[in-house]
């Protein structure tokens, strides 16, 4: 049986994922400036490189400090990414937002995995990761549909403002 502390991690991961919609919106944002079509892949590359570079040091740090503190730092970085992307006035500033998004991913994704592993009994670890990923995927779908609706019916800026606000609510819940 999966204990209450596991379900708290699942809930935290689900709420965090609701605050972080698909990276496709990074491509849309950087492409909104009528710049070269190469900016879209550049945004994903930037996010991925920063994510990859940050993941290992964040993992080392997670082994030494409270995971909740590292998740909180990751949420602060995502709020900053949303702010930069909301205020972006050029592909360069949108690219900076994508870099911050990657840093957020590096600070949070491995930590969440470690928290799942640490709260699930060994005999149920595969099932625990399956449930965690199922709910995270469902929340990412919901978040992305909502972000798309905001993008289309309100504005691209509103998408990132609401994303940042949801991150703030998640951060308050974490503290």
Residue locations for each model-derived region?
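Juxtamembrane intracellular "pre-TM" segments in multi-pass secondary transporters
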Residues: 1-10
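Short amphipathic helix-loop junctions that connect adjacent transmembrane helices
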Residues: 24-40
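Loop-to-transmembrane helix entry/capping segments in MFS-fold secondary transporters
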Residues: 37-38, 122-132
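Residue-level signature of mid-helix packing/kink "hotspots" within the transmembrane helices
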Residues: 48-56, 137-141
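Helix-to-loop junctions at the C-terminal end of transmembrane segments
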Residues: 54-66, 151
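Structural signature of the two symmetry-related core transmembrane helices
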Residues: 69-84, 164
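Intracellular juxtamembrane helix-capping segments at the cytosolic ends
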Residues: 107-120
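A membrane-interface helix-boundary motif in multi-pass transporters
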Residues: 149-166
